[in-house]
Amino acid sequence: MSHHKLQESYDHVIVGGGVAADKAARAINERTPDASVLIITRDAEGPVFRPDLTKGLWLDDSTTVEDIALGTADDTGAQLATGTTVTSIDPSSHTVTTDSGDSVDTVAYGTLLLATGASPKTLDGTGGTDGTDGTGDDRVAYIRSLSDYRTLREKVTAGTRVAVVGGGYIGSEAAVALNAVGATVDLYTPDERVLGHMFPASITDHLEEVYAAKGVTVHHGFQLDHLDTGDTSGTSSTALTLVPTDGDAVSADVAVIGFGAVLETGLAQDAGLALEDGGVAVDISLSTSAPDVYAAGDIAVFTDPLLGRRHVEHVDNAEQSGTVAGTNMAGGAESYEYTPLFFSDIFDDGYEAVGTLSTELDVVEDWNDDRTAAVVYYLRDQVVQGVLLWNTWDSVPAARKILSASKGGTLSVDDLPGSIPVGDGE
């Protein structure tokens, strides 16, 4: 919880403790170093580089918790209220109400940033805030915060049977991370292939082989109905039981849930801010419909110059939009005109991407000769909507140029192969 009593007012208040909040605080400090800034987060600790919760902390023995802490308060002078929830926003009076568990406070702001991000989608389909889905069982993990990571890491040692439920972005990474520390990992996906909603069969077939070779057992067509945590009243806990909608139940020592995420828009909605496509609508300055209230990161629905109105739940967008929002909160006049990238590594393979990757779109694949690297284009009505750079590096600017040229009608489908040099697979 907060280490210092809250002031009655601040020049700038930031709700959320992720990367967007960190970047906004830094931008404010750079422009107006004497401004008072309050960052409010329900997390127990300050902002960290969240991608490493499923990447570096597991895959690199030299990466420590201290390494991924962003040092926001120390670097910017912002006051950090951890373990604190914002219960309401009143745009008309320019105030927020907070609850730290010890006290309820009303704080006035000059400008306000909503950088509340997204919460893991829980077993009942809602967004979770405590990482336990209401079961009270810390063997059921959602990897969102540093606390989640610490709890999971304490539970997992070599040979621990871990069920990863969900074959999407988080599930695919979590399986790799847990395998790296010697856990016995079973990956359960309702789909025919891991990441099958994003990647064509040429890639997902390869990934199936890689997971198997590394010792991760993939189970397809597994739709989880409910999870039985058993009797944990004794000194030793029984195994978790995962019960599918169809087929036999399976057991595990720990379950990691990767169902996707739910945007945290409740505060904005209750305050009467304009919502759009499940997120918070912002203009080119990242201002919301309420005066002096901005939004950045996952929840912000912005105008991508190449792809139109969208929200993006990846760290690059959080960093870039947080910086622009913070600059404008401090009196700047920057425009957010950016097409974010995202990235991941799956064992020895990796990728960067821009735009929409969906196998519901038309796909054009361009492979190197030994089929270890590719550039994959995703099209709707012959216009490129996304570019996947599979084991192909330093090509994101080129991918953005492809999106722009295709949108402008100066690049045909036949021109795509060879337009971005394919990597060598290294």
Stretches with model-predicted labels:
Residues 136-160, 234, 242-243, 249-319, ...:
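FAD-site-proximal beta/loop scaffold in flavoenzymes
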Residues 248-273, 349-426:
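C-terminal catalytic lobe of FAD-dependent flavoproteins
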